[in-house]
């Protein structure tokens, strides 16, 4: 494949005048797809860093044992809202299951489908929910007013103001290779004094450990952003975990958001 990342339309020996990235997004290029992940963490303290960039906060707990997932809201009136949960099944293949909320009641997602990863969920029906929705695995011990315990069982959170997860984490499906194209991060602080944070892109290949791929220093007099486009995209193999993590912050109550873009390529055409 020539000029795969230049924007020219050359795939599998076919050349044209269109934009390759646009055509991938439109689903016109067989075996190629785009993943856009985004997340935020609204409160990171000097005593709690490092933290991952997801609304639930703290470090994300991975469970490599495939398990049934559950869902509940902390609002008892959130009944009948349709939620779609996306992740990977026990074979690390892409899986999407739809479930209806039942208020604060622990509700099984699906009819026995197992998830080894959950990395996105959103309201897919016509009615928005009012509480905060949590998705958690079978390591849960108890659920009180819709909130599971221990917190390490939580695999995703959807806040009412978003109706969509904000979690800058992803796992590459089996049979695919990810190409890390771009990432951006920003920090906010409600005062005018300069603050700073260190962002860390961390990747764990299947069977390995998390390794730091890039550190980005952010500084702010109220807000700051950092954008990086890979001239030569980073190749990430199947079943690898990707997490955007805040390594350190200089002050308490730091808010951080991150986003990254991947191109997924089927291994059969890579």
Task: Label each region the model flagged.
Residues 3-117, 122-270:
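Beta-strand-centric surfaces of beta-sandwich/beta-rich domains
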């Amino acid at each position: 494949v020539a000029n795969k990342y230049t924007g020219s339309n050359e795939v599998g020996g076919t050349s044209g005048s269109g934009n390759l990235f646009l055509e991938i997004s439109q689903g016109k290029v067989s075996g190629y797809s785009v993943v856009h992940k985004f997340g935020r963490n609204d409160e990171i303290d000097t005593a709690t860093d490092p933290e991952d960039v997801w609304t639930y906060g703290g470090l994300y707990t991975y469970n490599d044992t495939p398990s049934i997932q559950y869902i509940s809201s902390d609002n008892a009136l959130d009944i009948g809202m349709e939620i779609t949960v996306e992740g990977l099944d026990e074979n690390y293949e892409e899986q999407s299951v739809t479930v209806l909320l039942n208020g604060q009641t622990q509700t099984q997602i699906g009819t026995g489908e197992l998830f080894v990863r959950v990395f996105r969920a959103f309201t897919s029906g016509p009615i928005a929910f009012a509480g905060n929705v949590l998705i958690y695995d079978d390591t849960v011990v108890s659920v009180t007013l819709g909130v599971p315990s221990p917190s390490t069982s939580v695999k995703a959170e959807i806040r009412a103001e978003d109706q969509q997860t904000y979690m800058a984490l992803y796992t590459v499906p089996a049979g695919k290779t990810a190409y890390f194209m771009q990432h951006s991060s920003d920090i906010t602080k409600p005062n005018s004094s300069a603050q700073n944070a260190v962002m860390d892109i961390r990747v764990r290949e299947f069977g390995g450990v998390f390794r730091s791929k890039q550190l980005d220093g952010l500084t702010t007099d109220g807000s700051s952003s950092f954008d990086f486009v890979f001239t030569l995209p980073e190749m990430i193999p199947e079943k690898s975990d990707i997490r955007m993590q805040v390594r350190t912050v200089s002050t308490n109550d730091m808010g951080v958001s991150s986003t990254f873009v991947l191109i997924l390529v089927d291994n059969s055409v890579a």
